[in-house]
Curated annotation (Swiss-Prot):
PROSITE patterns: PPM_1, PPM_2. Mn(2+) 1 binds at residues 69-70. Mn(2+) 2 binds at residues 69, 231, 270. Keywords: Hydrolase, Magnesium, Manganese, Metal-binding, Protein phosphatase. Its EC number is 3.1.3.16. This is Probable protein phosphatase 2C 71. Residues 284-447 are annotated as: Disordered. Residues 33-279 form the PPM-type phosphatase domain. The lineage of its organism: Eukaryota, Viridiplantae, Streptophyta, Embryophyta, Tracheophyta. The keyword Repeat does not apply. GO terms for cellular component: plastid.
């Protein structure tokens, strides 16, 4: 027995963390570039997923970016990654009323996920932090604690808030629905789940909703870049620190690799996934003649982000104009778009997200004040933040959060299906960097 313990200890000490899978691309109209990096970190399984894609819809070049952090396994995060954006771009009001379309797509995807979960005995769920670029608009939507941060005028601003059960409005909503919030290492819904909004989580669905908070920003010369990341990054980075790193590295792929690598060095115990989108509006405007007609007809460049394909150092250092040749690849593989293996720990960030964005939109929130958790630098605030939670934190020093669900601790509420409006999008061929099935033109699920 002693030998086994020694062998296990030696194995854990010698475990090598693989370099993050990474890639990037440039939009067809030259208005934005992007990069991504993802690593299992110190874990032996991977529950993070991400999506980067560019579509032509009704004459508009549309960018769609997302980070999805699973709990209770990877299947919920993988499902959301496969279906959320496809549901969104086929919504009949995607261009005319994008906010409404986003809300419908979130609730519809959640409803369909719950149906697919009926055969599973163990609950699974996922966060989502998504960014939609349409014309001169940036729309950020999220559920859970995967955060979105922008750099505007050189300063960091959170454009999402982490959904935590101890936030006063979230706790009130949960209790009004018949649920409760209790301390179990951190504040948890039903003593089980450390986020108050998520996809899936069938047994807690009455309290853990997938209703997104949506924030809109104007894309102008002052907007420099956007960071989307799972909490594996935010556990060890403040918003300002992450923005400072990206400022120093012009190439978005290289900046995401640097963020992920530094998060591992700082001791992040979770999977780490990061997407950076750089806005090139001001640069392209100063370019001689802006973009030529020849450039306007080019196919969006891309590097694939299929995580079941291991990206070598040689591939990640190539120019980001490699066109994805795997569009017709069978997407039924269970390992699609998973990054190098790793497991989820859920050490939650103790940071207060920003109260107001650069355009004056309020996005206030409050994190639980847990002793022993990662402290983060103050965030720039433009208006009054949300009132503090009334919940008192017991005198404990636990900081490790476990988002895996124990289905025996909560009753199964009835899941209701959201119906969307009818219609079908007129779409150009999709330039997608993952999920070949999602790249095909599909009829609207809102019919």
């Amino acid at each position: 027995m002693g030998y086994m313990d020694l062998a296990l200890s030696y194995s854990n000490q010698m475990r090598i963390v693989e370099a993050p899978a990474s890639g990037g691309g440039l939009s067809q109209n030259g208005k934005f570039s992007y990069g991504y990096a993802s690593s299992a970190g110190k874990r032996s399984s991977m529950e993070d997923f991400f999506e980067t894609r560019i579509d032509g819809i009704d004459g508009e070049i549309v960018g769609l970016f997302g980070v999805f952090d699973g709990h209770g396994g990877s299947r919920a995060a993988e499902y959301v990654k496969r279906h959320l954006f496809s549901n969104l771009i086929t919504h009949p009001k995607f261009i005319s009323d994008t906010k409404s379309a986003i809300a419908d797509a979130y609730t519809h995807t959640d409803s369909e996920l719950l149906k697919s979960e009926n055969s599973h005995t163990r609950d699974a769920g996922s966060t989502a932090s998504t960014a939609i670029l349409v014309g001169d608009r940036l729309l950020v939507a999220n559920v859970g604690d995967s955060r979105a941060v922008i750099c505007r005028g050189g300063n960091a601003f959170a454009v999402s808030r982490d959904h935590k059960p101890d936030q006063s409005d979230e706790r009130e909503r949960i209790e009004n629905a018949g649920g409760f919030v209790m301390w179990a290492g951190t504040w948890r819904v039903g003593g089980v789940l450390a986020v108050s909004r998520a996809f899936g989580d069938r047994l807690l669905k009455q309290y853990v909703v997938a209703d997104p908070e949506i924030q809109e920003e104007k894309i102008d010369d002052s907007l420099e870049f956007l960071i989307l990341a799972s909490d594996g990054l935010w556990d060890v980075f403040s918003n300002e620190e992450a923005v400072a790193v990206v400022k120093e590295v012009e190439d978005p792929e290289e900046s995401t690799k640097k963020l992920v690598g530094e998060a591992i060095k700082r001791g992040s115990a979770d999977n780490i996934t990061c997407v950076v989108v750089r806005f090139l509006e001001s640069k392209s405007a100063n370019n001689n003649g802006s973009s030529s007609s020849e450039e306007a007809n080019q196919v969006p460049t891309a590097v694939r982000n299929d995580s079941d394909h291991k990206i070598s150092a040689k591939e990640t250092n190539q120019d980001h104009t490699t066109v994805n040749k795997d569009l017709d690849r069978n997407t039924d593989s269970q390992s699609l778009n998973q990054k190098p293996i790793a497991a989820r720990s859920a050490d939650n960030s103790n940071q207060k997200p920003i109260a107001t964005t650069a355009t004056g939109h309020s996005v206030s929130s409050e994190q639980s004040g847990l002793t022993g958790e990662k402290s983060q630098m103050p965030i720039k605030i433009r208006s009054d933040s949300e009132p503090k939670s009334s919940a008192k934190v017991p005198n404990q020093t636990q900081s490790t959060v476990h988002n895996d669900l124990d289905s025996s601790t909560a009753k199964k509420p009835a899941a209701t299906e959201q119906s969307g409006s009818t219609g079908e999008r007129n779409r150009k061929p999709i330039k997608v960097h993952s999920d070949s099935a999602a790249r095909k033109t599909t009829p609207s699920i809102f019919n």
